[in-house]
Amino acid sequence: MAEIRNYTINFGPQHPSAHGVLRLVLELDGEVVVRADPHIGLLHRGTEKLAETRTWVQSVPYMDRLDYVSMMCNEHAYCLAIERLLGLEVPIRAQYIRVMFDEITRILNHLLGIGTHALDIGAMTMVLYTFREREDLMDAYEAVSGARMHAAYYRPGGVYRDLPDRMPQYVVNKFKNANTVRELNENRQGSLLDFLEDFTERFNGYCDDYETLLTDNRIWKQRTVGIGVVTPEQAKAWGFTGPMLRGSGVAWDLRKKQPYEVYDRMDFDIPVGKNGDCYDRYLCRMEEMRQSNRIVKQCIDWLRKNPGPVIADNYKVAPPPRERMKGNMEELIHHFKLFTEGMHVPSGEVYAAIEHPKGEFGVYAVSDGANKPYRLKLRAPGFAHLAAMDEIARGHMIADVVAIIGTMDVVFGEIDR
């Protein structure tokens, strides 16, 4: 009699649904997954070790490159850790700017996550819509930092500079004619806050469009309802955070439970799922984008009425203004010392965590009083989610593995570090 054996296949790292460099070794019984073994490390760059050889501020750009879809949120956790070690008070305007850009980043992340998840399952229209909105928010990144992705905008003590009074303008080139440029620049005539206000007024309508495409779509529901079910007990035991935890019905959000910056002043709700499947996690992310839009609106209203400093007035931590530095020897010395030697952070250890779009992103920093971290440990939310891949995927069809990877919203910059 013939022996029936399971067979093993490699899913990725060249698979379009592997979201980067995931190598998944699947053991299959026919088309049913018996075991899923994630192999990570293909994007390991030694960020934690590199940080030990750089000054505290020089490591800020490394944070952008961890989860390279949620850039400013990574920076935020790192800056919070330094500020807690220093016992530094951040100006209130800088706190509002940080919260506003955290929520812009959350929208950016979820737009890409939902768009690519739908694309993986076979709904191509969605990703074309979401990239249209991402373009506007990337322009907001570019307006404050000059970069569309790796912004390096947050600093220990505040942010690099205040919000600009004018948006960057598109110009005619071989890809864009005069009419196209005129249309693109139409809502870019005012300040960044004007541009964002215009975006927030339009965005809920865009969310309705996405829901029209997916929420009641029969094929989308067949591919996501009842797939990748995680109970609340399992989610807690596996260390899930963010939409992966809230999709299972656990209302845990650091912005509400352990507020940082000015989140305690914000009016927003925490969307929570019921069934813990891929569909509920999708609904959570959709509603989170609407709530982020609410928070951005509140920040815009406050920032319009309250001008002020955007970085701490402590020249041992933040550089003096350029115009004062050029006329005062003492401030020139501060500037020189800060950019050559870097600031010295008092001895101690601290853990700072924020509600990152993917979950709890934490930075555990240890200082020995030098100008460089003694040790930096990064807690990436996607690491715990991917570790549960075997448990979640077992018993599903091979086609459902794609839906499960999409709902995890994994990015390997942060998982491999």
UniProtKB/Swiss-Prot annotation:
Its EC number is 7.1.1.-. InterPro entries: NADH_Q_OxRdtase_suD, NADH_UbQ_OxRdtase_49kDa_CS, NDH1_su_D/H, NiFe-Hase_large. It is found in: Cell inner membrane. Signal peptide: none annotated. It is an enzyme of class 7 (translocase). GO terms for molecular function: NAD binding; NADH:ubiquinone reductase (non-electrogenic) activity; quinone binding. It holds the Pfam family Complex1_49kDa. It is a peripheral membrane protein. It comes from the Bacteria. It catalyses: a quinone + NADH + 5 H(+)(in) = a quinol + NAD(+) + 4 H(+)(out). GO terms for cellular component: plasma membrane. PROSITE patterns: COMPLEX1_49K (PS00535). NDH-1 is composed of 14 different subunits. Subunits NuoB, C, D, E, F, and G constitute the peripheral sector of the complex. NDH-1 shuttles electrons from NADH, via FMN and iron-sulfur (Fe-S) centers, to quinones in the respiratory chain. The immediate electron acceptor for the enzyme in this species is believed to be ubiquinone. Couples the redox reaction to proton translocation (for every two electrons transferred, four hydrogen ions are translocated across the cytoplasmic membrane), and thus conserves the redox energy in a proton gradient. Belongs to the complex I 49 kDa subunit family. This is NADH-quinone oxidoreductase subunit D. The lineage of its organism: Bacteria, Pseudomonadati, Pseudomonadota, Betaproteobacteria, Rhodocyclales.
